[in-house]
A protein has these predicted regions:
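Generic detection of short hydrophobic beta-strand segments and adjacent strand-loop junctions
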Residues: 7-9, 135-138, 199-201
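Long, hydrophobic, amphipathic alpha-helical segments used as structural scaffolds
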Residues: 34, 38-41, 87, 91-98, ...
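Gly/serine-rich nucleotide phosphate-binding loop at the start of the catalytic core
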Residues: 1-76
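Positively charged, helix-rich recognition surfaces that bind polyanionic ligands
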Residues: 142-144, 157-367
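Stable alpha-helical structural segments in soluble proteins, enriched in small hydrophobic residues
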Residues: 33, 79-90, 352-362, 366
Length: 367
């Protein structure tokens, strides 16, 4: 299986210049090949493959722009392949048409492939060898076993540099368990399980969100492009990064616990893109990070021989009595948090009852 290990790197001034050049050249090649693809289609109504785009880069672009030859060839090829992935998504998944990349993008990255030992991690010296950069200082906080496949160098908006090493490695699956669980994704709580356990949303994030509001207010009073403007902007980026890291770490802990304790995990397949169009709920939905939680559950279930099922969005999990199956239309009102089934008299907590129904439906689908 493929697994990524992310490390912070500390490039020197010469290495930072080379990384910046690579970011710029990858962006340039991405934009040029996207424009070439569009032009050929408009003129000749002919589709252009990623191989055609790669040949165009090697034969035309590198001839006209000599400085492209100073950049790692795999990084340029992967930029073209990334453009092709975005292009294929436009046709197959009805995503938006690929956009041209801007040099002002907050997140910059490029990917290079392993060949003939050009990527190596030395845990003794705390350095990572990368094409065109040689040895880069790194914080190697955890070791790995396996064969390196690629490395992705990135720079986030706070200015920090990272490298993600993709490794082909063996993974020992978790021991089989007979316990199954249903999950009701919420806003007040991150999620509630069919066992009645509520995973709360982190309260500490509110502290950093207050800091963020204060910093954004300060930024609005700074002269644009002044030194203090950029200092405050960096503080804002660091605050965003802190919030993102706290949230992601918490989601990893929650998803690990759910996967470790259960063989079958069932949740709703929520259409988050459509839900955030409701401006009253958009921030709350983004804050609880349903997408990231379900993404983690999905890949961790595959790693560990678990079954993760998503049931239909429109399944009436909140309206059904989990004891007798009676459908109560009164529970369409979101303010109804507890109710008694008119048919069997069972008392229900709205969220726990929904989680039980979600589990029942998921198990029915795989029976």
């Amino acid at each position: 299986m493929l697994k990524a290990y992310k490390y912070r790197i500390y490039p020197n001034s010469e290495q930072r210049i080379q990384i910046a050049k690579t970011f710029g050249c990858c962006r340039f090649v991405y934009n040029q090949t996207l424009a070439y693809r569009r032009e050929i289609y408009e003129k000749e109504k002919k589709s252009v493959s990623k191989t055609d785009c790669n040949n165009y880069c090697n034969r035309e672009l590198k001839k006209d722009y000599e400085w492209l030859k100073e950049i790692d060839k795999f990084a340029l090829t992967n930029a073209i392949y990334n453009m092709d992935v975005a292009y294929q998504k436009f046709f197959k998944e009805h995503a938006g048409y690929p956009k041209f990349k801007s040099k002002h993008d907050n997140h910059k990255s490029y990917t290079t492939n392993f060949t003939n030992g050009n990527i190596a991690v030395d845990f003794e010296t705390g350095k990572i060898k990368l094409p065109k950069l040689k040895a880069v200082k790194a914080r190697l906080h955890r070791e790995y076993r396996g064969q390196i496949k690629s490395a992705t160098v990135s720079q986030v908006s706070s200015g920090k540099y990272y490298v993600s090493i993709l490794v082909e490695t063996e993974h020992k699956e978790l021991a089989h368990t007979n316990h199954n669980i249903g999950i009701d994704l919420g806003i007040k709580d991150l999620c509630i399980t069919s066992d009645g356990k509520a995973y709360e949303n982190l309260k500490i994030i509110k502290k950093y969100e207050k800091q963020l509001v204060k910093l954004q207010r300060q930024l609005s009073h700074k002269g644009k492009r002044s030194k203090n403007y950029y200092k405050t902007k960096k503080k804002i980026a660091l605050c965003h990064e802190k919030i993102r890291n706290i949230r992601k770490d918490y989601l990893h802990k929650v998803s690990h616990e759910i996967i470790s304790e259960n063989q079958v995990i069932v949740s709703e397949n929520l259409q988050i893109k459509n839900m955030v169009k409701n401006h009253h709920l958009a921030k709350a939905i983004s804050d609880v990070s349903w997408y990231e939680l379900t993404r983690q559950l999905e890949y961790k279930a595959k790693w560990n021989g678990r079954k993760y099922i998503k049931i239909d969005t429109f399944y009436a999990s909140s309206q059904l009595c989990s004891v007798c199956g009676y459908q109560n239309p009164d529970t369409k009102d979101l303010s109804v948090r507890t109710w008694i089934c008119p048919k069997c008299g069972a008392e229900h907590d709205r969220d726990i009852n929904a989680a039980k129904n979600i589990l029942t439906e998921g198990l029915r689908q795989i029976a």
